[in-house]
A protein has these predicted regions:
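Short beta-strand "acidic-cap" motif of Rossmann-like dinucleotide-binding folds
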Residues: 27-29
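Aromatic pocket-lining residues of Rossmann-like dinucleotide-binding sites
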Residues: 20
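NAD(P)-cofactor binding segment of oxidoreductase domains
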Residues: 52-89, 117-123
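Active-site Tyr-X1-5-Lys
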Residues: 110-130
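Adenosine-cofactor binding site in Rossmann-like domains, unifying the SAM/SAH pocket
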Residues: 31-46
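N-terminal Rossmann-fold NAD(P) dinucleotide-binding loop
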Residues: 13-14
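Conserved N-terminal Rossmann-fold NAD(P)-binding element of oxidoreductases
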Residues: 4-8
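Conserved Rossmann-fold NAD(P)-dependent oxidoreductase catalytic core, especially the SDR/UDP-sugar
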Residues: 76-112
Length: 130
C-alpha cells in the first residue's frame, strides 16, 4: 500500500485519512499544533523526513491571510524534489466562479473571487510540472 503525507488534517482530509488507513495505507499528517499524533506543521525535520518516504502528498491548507500558501512557502522546494509519485492540492470549487451548473475540472479557467485561492491552485499545478 501507499504512504500519504497530508498537510492540514482538518475535516475533509481527516475523512480521507480514515478511509486510507482502513485500506492499509500509512498516513502521516500535519496540524498547526501536532495534536493527536500528527506532526506539527513547523517541525521541519519531521516534515522533511515524511516528504522523503511519502508515495503520495496532499495539501488541504488554504492560503493564509496574506494570500500566501503556507505549505509552498515553507516546504515548496522540498516538495518539488520529493520522490512521491502523486502530489495533490485539495482546493475549492469556488476557484471556478459561477459556472451556471456546468461541469468543471482542472482544465477549466479560474474565475473565482478569491485571488489567493486561485493563485494557490496555479502554484500547486506548476509545482512539479506533471
Amino acid at each position: 500500500m501507499g504512504h500519504i503525507l497530508i498537510f492540514g488534517l482538518g475535516y475533509s482530509a481527516g475523512h480521507l485519512a480514515t478511509r486510507l488507513r482502513a485500506r492499509g495505507w500509512a498516513v502521516t499528517a500535519t496540524t498547526r499544533d501536532g495534536r493527536g499524533g500528527t506532526l506539527r506543521f513547523g517541525d521541519g525535520e519531521g516534515v522533511h523526513a515524511a516528504l522523503r518516504c511519502a508515495t503520495h502528498i496532499l495539501s488541504s491548507v488554504p492560503p493564509d491571510e496574506a494570500g500566501q500558501d503556507p505549505v509552498l512557502a515553507t516546504y515548496g522546494e522540498a516538495l518539488a524534489l520529493a520522490p512521491a509519485g502523486w502530489v495533490g492540492y485539495l482546493s475549492s470549487t469556488g476557484v471556478y466562479g459561477d459556472t451556471g451548473g456546468a461541469w468543471v475540472d482542472e482544465s477549466a479557467p479560474l474565475r473565482g473571487r478569491r485571488p489567493a485561492r486561485n493563485a494557490a491552485d496555479l502554484s500547486w499545478r506548476a509545482l512539479r510540472g506533471d
